[in-house]
């Protein structure tokens, strides 16, 4: 039974399943499962939603039930505030000048928009806070403008800034000297220089050192916060200052949003280098200065940057597919770049190996040095300084000073006697005062150098001294009264082995050559300005035209001479007919073909002659020496040491030389100087041109002639002064007395006695600020004051002898008085007034606005420049600075001194920490000038009192003062 029942169950079950599958299909199982899952999931979702709603209702009931009831006054007040917002009236007047207020208001608006509003509107829509900030800033600006109007800015711009800059430069110079004097063989790093700089600063300032502010960003921010808070106390109304939230907010905006970014930019060396290049952007690039910078550079990064750029340019030029005329230009450029690359590689290798070469010491080991004649030394300031130092060492300074004093006496006597004769010719009343003063001056020279009481005494023949004494006693003094003895003294200095011959073997002679720029190697082999042997008249040297000697031709009006430089060299003989460039034993130079026409009554002749630029230069020196009036009329085109084979340059020089020839051959010129024809005919004759001066002589003339011409100009200016005879005699008497007195003091104190070696004390001028060393008589003379400060500190003239420094001072005084007189002070004061005028202030504000917000939009951050670009900018900046230095300055203080001074100033700006120090010094001086009634000096001393260098200095003072106190 059971078996049958189970079979029936399984049978009926199977039948049901089969019928179910046949009826609903084979996927009914999946559908059924899906329906069940949806049912269960829907039930869970409904349960969760119902529970969430009930929970929120319960929590809301709990909150309202436990918290106290809300006061109805608060919502009411909020509604009233929103309904009637308090209006803040802002006066848009700031400085009283509309041209300043308008751009200044835009700066305030842009600042609030880009630095405050963008985050404030995410917190609140209330405008009152923004208006309060604007009102606070305007109040501060109004107080600042009012204070600025009451201040005389002329002393700050003409005195304080110059003193601060000069002192900063002095500290840097002394820090460099300390680094150099260290015994460590390892070269000092930039960190050592910065530390040494602040050590020197505290020694000089005594009461303040800014090392923490300049080297620690955290301390710098704290310093700026304290400073801004003090300024807000002075500029804001008491009510606004007592609002701490507002005060701290404005303080942070000023300190971190305005002052700190501005100081970061002003102290960035790369920014300063770009600004220097922009300031002198109009000056032409000097290739000689560029090569000097490369050869003198001790920064491997600079050399690598220049070398990589040269390699890049070489690759570009070699990839060009050119033919014809352009190929010569490209070859010249490639050769120039290869030379630059070679110089950079050799300099890098030398720096990496540590085998630095001192050019002066290296030249001293060479036997072949340029010979500078004694007469050239005596007329050049730079050369005379070194010869004077040598004569002091050998004890022959009395001979040199006697020669110089006699030269001064001769010039003075000639001028005064000419004035005396001119007044006699005019029939004016004369006195014997002039001759009496000349006699007194001559007797003073005799007593100081030649008498038996003279110490030291100039050793010359006794009969010459006796003859001079007799002349002084019985005859009127003449300018030539000392000529015989002066000639003997000159021969003694020239031939005595103790003096000039030994001087040529001394290290001072090599240093003199360096200052005269006569140790310099030629930087480029090919040169149009070559100083070698002149071309022999034709390209092949085989043309010999049978012409009469032009030197025998007179300057009669019947003979007419015309000459011009043709476009190309004579085609039958010139292999470079287009370029006019020749090559002789590997040396490339340009050759100019001159077509000459000579006409007279019966015949006409024409020929070609060939001259180099060096021939023109030698010819120009010849005729200007013989005919001084031509020096102001004829102007020869200047030299170009590097890359002077360029086609455009050669064409320009050809035009300039043509203009020079036409002016020279003008009939009026020939009539004015009849003897000039001989020199012109000799130059234009078709034969090898014989130079009257060699390489060295022309270089000597280059630095001697400017000084000689300047002395002539000063002499002419003195002669043309419209003084009366009494005034002239009085001035002469004063000058002669001062000359004799000062010269005697200098000889006794500075030259005849060796100064004792004593340690530096607090009274040492080098350990004081620059302003503490100015003469009282030049304190009111603004231009002379500025020039003396800059000359002293930039070129370190205090290390030179006092004769040169006094000579430079007198030269500057004569230059200023002859050029402007007393009006230059007035012009400087007017310029300061113009700088602080409303128009210029408005222009500065507009430039600031346009720089930070071009077209009203905040400028994007400037991307950081690549290191190689910054290094090339450094090289370009140094090259520009060296190129703008006039040759006249080199002739006064020396080429080597000029180079060192310029590079010292440039190197000073390459340290961010030192630039920061200078910016803060200027800022402190500005605030001390703006608020003279407040004790800003004491405030800054307190703010910088945590300086580590200051603490070390105080400890050092205590240790040095302790023994002296114990003795007491």
Swiss-Prot record:
Residues 373-496 form the RGS domain. It is found in: Early endosome membrane. The keyword Membrane applies. CDD domains: PX_SNX13, RGS_SNX13. It is a peripheral membrane protein. The keyword Protein transport applies. One of its GO terms (cellular component) is early endosome membrane. A 1,2-diacyl-sn-glycero-3-phospho-(1D-myo-inositol-3-phosphate) binds at residues 612, 614, 639, 653. Pfam families: Nexin_C, PX, PXA, RGS. It comes from the Eukaryota. Residues 570-691 form the PX domain. SUPFAM superfamilies: PX domain (SSF64268), Regulator of G-protein signaling, RGS (SSF48097). GO terms for molecular function: phosphatidylinositol binding; phosphatidylinositol-3-phosphate binding. Its main location: membrane. Belongs to the sorting nexin family. The PX domain mediates interaction with membranes enriched in phosphatidylinositol 3-phosphate. This is Sorting nexin-13. It comes from Homo sapiens (Human).
């Amino acid at each position: 039974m059971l078996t049958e029942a189970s079979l029936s169950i399984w049978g009926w079950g199977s039948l049901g399943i089969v019928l179910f599958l046949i009826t609903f299909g084979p996927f009914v199982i999946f559908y059924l499962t899906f329906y069940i899952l949806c049912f269960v999931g829907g039930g869970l979702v409904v349960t969760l939603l119902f529970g969430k709603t009930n929970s929120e209702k319960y929590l809301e009931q709990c909150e309202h039930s436990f918290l106290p009831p809300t006061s109805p006054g608060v919502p009411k007040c909020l509604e009233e505030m929103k309904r009637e917002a308090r209006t803040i009236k802002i006066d848009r007047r700031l400085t009283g000048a509309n041209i300043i207020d308008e751009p200044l208001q835009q700066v305030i608006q842009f600042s609030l928009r880009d630095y405050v509003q963008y985050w404030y509107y995410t917190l609140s829509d209330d405008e009152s806070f923004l208006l309060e900030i604007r009102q606070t800033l305007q109040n501060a600006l109004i107080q600042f403008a009012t204070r600025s109007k009451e201040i005389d800015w002329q002393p700050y711009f003409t005195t304080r800034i110059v003193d601060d800059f000069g002192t900063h430069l002095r500290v840097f110079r002394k820090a460099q000297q300390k680094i150099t004097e260290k015994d460590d063989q390892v070269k000092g790093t930039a960190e050592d220089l910065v530390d040494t700089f602040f050590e020197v600063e505290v020694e000089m300032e005594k009461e303040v050192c800014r090392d923490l502010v300049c080297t620690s960003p955290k301390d710098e921010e704290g310093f700026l916060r304290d400073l801004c808070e003090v300024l807000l106390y002075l500029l804001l109304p008491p009510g606004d200052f007592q609002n701490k939230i507002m005060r701290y907010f404005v303080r942070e905006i000023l300190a971190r949003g305005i002052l700190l970014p501005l100081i970061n930019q002003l102290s960035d060396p790369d920014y300063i280098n770009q600004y220097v290049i922009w300031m002198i952007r109009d000056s032409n690039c000097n290739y000689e200065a560029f090569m000097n910078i490369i050869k003198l550079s001790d920064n491997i990064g600079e050399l690598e940057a220049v070398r990589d750029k040269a390699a890049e340019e070489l690759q570009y030029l070699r990839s060009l597919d050119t033919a014809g005329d352009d190929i010569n230009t490209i070859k010249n450029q490639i050769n120039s770049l290869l030379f630059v690359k070679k110089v950079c590689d050799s300099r890098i290798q030398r720096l990496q190996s540590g085998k630095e070469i001192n050019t002066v010491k290296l030249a001293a080991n060479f036997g072949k040095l340029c010979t500078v004649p004694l007469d050239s030394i005596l007329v050049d300031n730079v050369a005379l300084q070194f010869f004077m130092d040598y004569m002091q060492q050998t004890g022959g300074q009395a001979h040199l000073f006697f020669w110089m004093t006699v030269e001064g006496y001769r010039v003075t006597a000639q001028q005064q006697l000419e004035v005396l004769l001119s007044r006699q010719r005019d029939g004016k009343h004369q006195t014997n005062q002039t001759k009496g003063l000349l006699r007194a001056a001559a007797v003073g020279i005799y007593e100081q150098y030649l008498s038996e009481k003279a110490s030291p005494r100039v050793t010359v023949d006794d009969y010459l001294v006796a003859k001079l004494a007799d002349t002084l006693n019985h005859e009127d003094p003449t300018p030539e009264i000392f000529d015989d003895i002066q000639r003997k003294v000159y021969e003694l200095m020239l031939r005595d082995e103790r003096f000039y011959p030994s001087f040529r073997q001394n290290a001072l002679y090599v240093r003199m050559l360096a200052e005269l720029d006569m140790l310099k190697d030629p930087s480029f082999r090919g040169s149009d300005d070559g100083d070698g042997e002149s071309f022999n008249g034709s390209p092949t040297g085989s043309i010999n035209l049978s012409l009469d000697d032009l030197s025998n031709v007179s300057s009669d009006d019947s003979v007419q001479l015309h000459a011009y430089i043709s476009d190309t060299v004579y085609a039958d003989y010139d292999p470079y007919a287009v370029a006019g460039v020749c090559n002789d034993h590997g040396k490339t130079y340009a050759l100019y073909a001159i077509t000459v026409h000579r006409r007279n009554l019966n015949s006409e002749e024409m020929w070609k002659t060939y001259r180099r630029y060096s021939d023109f230069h030698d010819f120009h020196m010849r005729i200007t020496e013989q005919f001084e009036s031509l020096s102001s009329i004829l102007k020869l085109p200047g030299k170009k040491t590097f890359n002077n084979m360029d086609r455009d340059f050669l064409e320009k020089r050809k035009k300039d030389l043509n203009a020079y020839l036409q002016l020279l051959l003008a009939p009026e010129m020939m009539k004015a100087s009849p003897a000039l024809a001989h020199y012109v005919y000799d130059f234009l004759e078709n034969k090898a041109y014989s130079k009257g001066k060699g390489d060295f002589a022309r270089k000597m003339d280059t630095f001697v002639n400017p000084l000689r011409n300047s002395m002539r100009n000063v002499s002419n200016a003195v002669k043309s002064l419209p003084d009366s005879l009494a005034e002239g005699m009085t001035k002469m008497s004063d000058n002669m007395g001062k000359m004799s007195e000062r010269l005697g003091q200098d000889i006794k104190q500075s030259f005849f006695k060796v100064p004792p070696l004593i340690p530096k004390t607090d009274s040492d001028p080098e350990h004081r600020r620059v302003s503490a060393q100015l003469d009282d008589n030049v304190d009111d003379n603004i231009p002379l004051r500025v020039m003396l400060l800059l000359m002293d500190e930039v070129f370190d003239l205090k290390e030179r002898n006092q004769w040169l420094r006094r000579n430079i001072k007198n030269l500057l005084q004569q230059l200023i008085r002859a050029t402007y007189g007393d009006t230059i002070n007035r012009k400087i004061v007017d310029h300061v007034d113009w700088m602080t005028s409303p128009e210029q202030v408005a222009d500065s504000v507009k430039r600031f606005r346009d720089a930070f917000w071009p077209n009203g939009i905040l400028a994007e951050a400037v991307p950081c420049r690549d290191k190689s670009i910054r290094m090339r900018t450094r090289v370009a900046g140094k090259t520009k600075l060296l190129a703008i230095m006039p040759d006249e300055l080199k002739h006064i203080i020396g080429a080597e001194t000029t180079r060192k001074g310029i590079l010292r100033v440039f190197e000073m700006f390459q340290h961010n920490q030192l630039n920061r120090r200078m910016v803060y010094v200027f800022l402190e001086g500005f605030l001390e000038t703006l608020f003279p009634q407040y004790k800003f000096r004491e405030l800054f001393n307190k703010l910088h009192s945590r300086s580590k260098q200051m603490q070390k200095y105080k400890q050092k003072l205590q240790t040095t003062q302790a023994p002296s106190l114990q003795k007491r």
